[in-house]
């Protein structure tokens, strides 16, 4: 499963770990995703993976 928000499309960001000796290794910061039941229609609900910023901003309506 991809680490991508199904509402805004936000995905992981990539960067570097840098130690005190300045050794550099690649790393990634994942999105804070939560499985949420969302209202799709008047009677239908769907479970989607949504980032917490979309939940806080009210872009979805929970079922």
Swiss-Prot record:
Keyword Ribonucleoprotein appears in the UniProt entry: yes
One cellular-component annotation, GO: ribonucleoprotein complex
Domain of life the protein comes from: Bacteria
Any one GO BP annotation for this protein: translation
A Pfam family annotated for this UniProt entry: Ribosomal_L28
InterPro entries in alphabetical order: Bacterial_rp_bL28, Ribosomal_bL28, Ribosomal_bL28/bL31-like_sf, Ribosomal_bL28_bact-type, Ribosomal_bL28_sf
Keyword line: Ribonucleoprotein, Ribosomal protein
HAMAP family: Ribosomal_bL28
Protein name: Large ribosomal subunit protein bL28
Species this protein is from: Acidobacterium capsulatum (strain ATCC 51196 / DSM 11244 / BCRC 80197 / JCM 7670 / NBRC 15755 / NCIMB 13165 / 161)
């Amino acid at each position: 499963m991809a680490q991508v928000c199904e509402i805004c499309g936000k995905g992981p960001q990539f960067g570097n770990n840098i130690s005190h000796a300045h050794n550099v290794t690649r790393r990634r910061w994942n999105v804070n995703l939560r499985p949420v039941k969302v209202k799709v229609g008047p009677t239908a609900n769907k479970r989607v993976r949504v980032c917490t910023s979309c939940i806080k901003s009210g872009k979805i309506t929970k079922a």
